[in-house]
Structures are given as C-alpha cells and as structure tokens.
C-alpha cells in the first residue's frame, strides 16, 4: 500500500487513543516470575512480562538500550506527526458524519451531529498535544524511567523480577497519554452531559453509548498491520543476527505500540472527558451485534470468500471464490467486484493455510482480532 494511502489511515489515529484494542495483558505474575527463560520464548511473552528490552538486548541479539528507546520514540513521533497533517480533521469529520447517518436509531442522528459540532475540535486539539512518547515506550520496556529507582535496604530481597516491579495502572491514562486533564474540560459540563436531573428529555438520550460506539467504529477501521509495515522503514539500529529480523521486529512492536495506543486507552475516558460519562461501560444500551457493521463489508466479504476457497484445491480457488458470492446474505455484485479486485493476492495468500481472518488481515481488509504479533510479511521468519 502506498504511503499516500497509509497517510489517511494514520490521520485517524489520535482521536482513537481510547478505542478498545485487542492486546490482552493476561500473563500472570507467577508465570513471568519464572524469569528470562520464560520471558524470551516469544515476543508476546516478552511484552506481557514487560521484558521486551531485556530480550532484545540480552537474548535475541546485541543492541543498546538507548538505541531501542530511540527507535520506539521515533515510531511514536512519526505517527503523531503524520496525524497532524492538514487533511486529518477533514478526513475524520467526514467519517464520523457518515457514521452518524447510519445509526440504527434515526432519532439519534441530529444529536450525533450536534455532539460532533460541539466536541470534535476540543478532542482533536487535546490529543494532538498530550501524547507522551516516552511514557508509552517505557510501558513497553524499551525506555528507562526518567526517575531514579528508590534504593533497596540491605538484606531485603525483591520477590519479583525487575520487569514486574511497579505494576502498571489499569487503565494507563493518567501516566501515558493523559498526564493532566485540561482545566477547561475538567471544570465545566458539556451541553450534552448525561446528568438528566439537570436536563429533562422526553427519553434518556444515550450520548455516552453514542460516543463509545463512534470511537469503536473508528478504531475497527484502522489497518494496524499495514501501518506497521510502513513505520518499519525507520528500523536502522537493531543489528540482530538473522537477516530480516530487524524489519520484522519493527513491524511487530509498531503493532504493539498501536495496540497500546488504541487498546489500553479505554473509550470511557474520552467520553468522560467531553460528556462527563460514567466509567462504567455497562451503563446505557449496548452496541448492536457487530457494532452495526454492514453485512457486506469488505471484511465479511473476504472471510466468506476465503473460507469457501480454503476448502478447495488450488486450481479450483477462483471458481470457489465466485461460488461464495451466491451466499444468501452477500451483496452479489459487491462480492464479485471484490473477488475480481483481489483474486491475484488471494491466489497467493489462500494456499498458505492461514485461517480466514488472518488471510483477510494480511490482505488489509480486516483489523487485528487475535494476537498482532505474527510477522506474516517475512516468509523467512
């Protein structure tokens, strides 16, 4: 994908800092306490145990800590700079207006557009000026804390390995991306606050649900894998032993960074910031199944077509993909156009034996659903 096309997706990044990501930080403290032998078995385990820097320096290759920190901060700065391009606000605004127009409850359309008018400029300005690259990279274990560690008393043993000291807050909001809430937004309620004791409506208007739903829709549209490939071009100082691993690692931890930005910053925060919403995600109506994704979206089309093709011989793949377009719920014309457009790439991807979602993710039409840590772009790894 050309960089000019990637730019428009990068410009969607900052307002989605609080989107629901897919990185699951579930490795237990007991497992991580096993030490480097466990941490460095895979990139995902190194990340979950906050030992990525250790594994890169001591186990997987020879690289200085300062180099790793600079690489990580470079990636964050690149993403941040690209997100501030002139077309950013126009691209985001048009996308959100389109989402307002396809809300399942038409009564919400005027309120949705009013929320955009009132709060869109505030949110954009805030996130463009508050990203803390060092905090994000420190969370990944690629940068050291700028504050000296407290000295340990003689005779006292540390029960946990270094990467597990100082457990991270959950969410990370206060220390990473939102170090200080802006006074103007913190002090005054917005015109669309959820406080119904002060404003009486014929029905309770679910602005907080609306806010979260819009953020989730934006986050789902960002092709993290494609962005990581572009950002990997900054890889220049990781002299690992096997050829190609440098670029692969850059792609991998670019996706990790994106997941940190998109996944660990909960949608409740932005909506609380501008609408005084509760941090309780159970409040208000739930998003409809599939978050009102159209049934014939490219991701759905791709997964249906790929599933059908995966059950066929290599010679029969083209016919099998067209046969999938006769499915009862698919838009036949859109499906055929999709097959015609992507047949060359799918003929290469389908025989690799990946599941349908991984194949469509590699094609760039589905977002990351499971682990983002597979380096699918380098067949040698």
Curated annotation (Swiss-Prot):
Disulfide bonds join 69-143, 72-137, 100-112, 208-277, 211-271, 235-246, 299-366, 302-360, 325-335. Residues 65-147, 204-281, 295-370 form the Saposin B-type domain. Residues 1-24 form the signal peptide. Its main location: secreted. One of its GO terms (cellular component) is lysosome. Glycans are attached at residues 129, 311. Coiled coil: none annotated. Gene3D superfamilies: Saposin-like. It comes from the Eukaryota. Keywords: Disease variant, Disulfide bond, Gaseous exchange, Glycoprotein, Repeat, Secreted, Signal, Surface film. Residues 25-200, 280-381 form a propeptide. Changing residue 228 to I: Requires 2 nucleotide substitutions. It is found in: Secreted, Extracellular space, Surface film. One of its GO terms (biological process) is respiratory gaseous exchange by respiratory system. Homodimer; disulfide-linked. Pulmonary surfactant-associated proteins promote alveolar stability by lowering the surface tension at the air-liquid interface in the peripheral air spaces. SP-B increases the collapse pressure of palmitic acid to nearly 70 millinewtons per meter. Pulmonary surfactant consists of 90% lipid and 10% protein. There are 4 surfactant-associated proteins: 2 collagenous, carbohydrate-binding glycoproteins (SP-A and SP-D) and 2 small hydrophobic proteins (SP-B and SP-C). It is linked to Pulmonary surfactant metabolism dysfunction 1: A rare lung disorder due to impaired surfactant homeostasis. It is characterized by alveolar filling with floccular material that stains positive using the periodic acid-Schiff method and is derived from surfactant phospholipids and protein components. Excessive lipoproteins accumulation in the alveoli results in severe respiratory distress. Respiratory distress syndrome in premature infants: A lung disease affecting usually premature newborn infants. It is characterized by deficient gas exchange, diffuse atelectasis, high-permeability lung edema and fibrin-rich alveolar deposits called 'hyaline membranes'. This is Pulmonary surfactant-associated protein B. It comes from Homo sapiens.
């Amino acid at each position: 994908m050309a960089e000019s096309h990637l730019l428009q997706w990068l410009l969607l990044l900052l307002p989605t800092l609080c989107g629901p990501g897919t990185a699951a930080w579930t490795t237990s403290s007991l497992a991580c306490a096993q030490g480097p032998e466990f941490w460095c078995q895979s990139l995902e385990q190194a990340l979950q145990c906050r030992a990525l820097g250790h594994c890169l320096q001591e186990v997987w290759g020879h690289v200085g800590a300062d180099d790793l920190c600079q690489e990580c901060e470079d990636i964050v700065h690149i993403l941040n700079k690209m997100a501030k391009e002139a077309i950013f606000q126009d691209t985001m605004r048009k996308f959100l207006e389109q989402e307002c127009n396809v809300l399942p409850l038409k009564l919400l359309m005027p309120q949705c557009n009013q929320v955009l008018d009132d709060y869109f400029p505030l949110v954009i300005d805030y996130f463009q000026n508050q990203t803390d690259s060092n905090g994000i990279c420190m969370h990944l274990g690629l940068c050291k804390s700028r504050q000296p560690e407290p000295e340990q008393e003689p005779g006292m043993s540390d029960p946990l390995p270094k990467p597990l000291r100082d457990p991270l807050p959950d969410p990370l909001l206060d220390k990473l991306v939102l170090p200080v809430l802006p006074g103007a937004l913190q002090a005054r309620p917005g015109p669309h606050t959820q406080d119904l004791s002060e404003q009486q409506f014929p029905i309770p208007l679910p602005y907080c649900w609306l806010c979260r739903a819009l953020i989730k829709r934006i986050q789902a549209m960002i092709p993290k894998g494609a962005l990581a490939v572009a950002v990997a071009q900054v890889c220049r100082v990781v002299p690992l032993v096997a050829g190609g691993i440098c670029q692969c690692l850059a792609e991998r931890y670019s996706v990790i960074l994106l997941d940190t930005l998109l996944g660990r910053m909960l949608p409740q925060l932005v909506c609380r910031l501008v609408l005084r919403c509760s941090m309780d995600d159970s409040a208000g109506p739930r998003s409809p199944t599939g978050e009102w994704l159209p049934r014939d979206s490219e991701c759905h089309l791709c997964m249906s077509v790929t599933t059908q093709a995966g059950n066929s011989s290599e010679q029969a793949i083209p016919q099998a993909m067209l046969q999938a377009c006769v499915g009862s719920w698919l838009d036949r014309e859109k499906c055929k156009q999709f097959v015609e457009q992507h047949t060359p790439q799918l003929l290469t991807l389908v025989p690799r034996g990946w599941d349908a979602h991984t194949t469509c993710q590699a094609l760039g039409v589905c977002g990351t659903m499971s682990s983002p840590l597979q380096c699918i772009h380098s067949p040698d790894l």
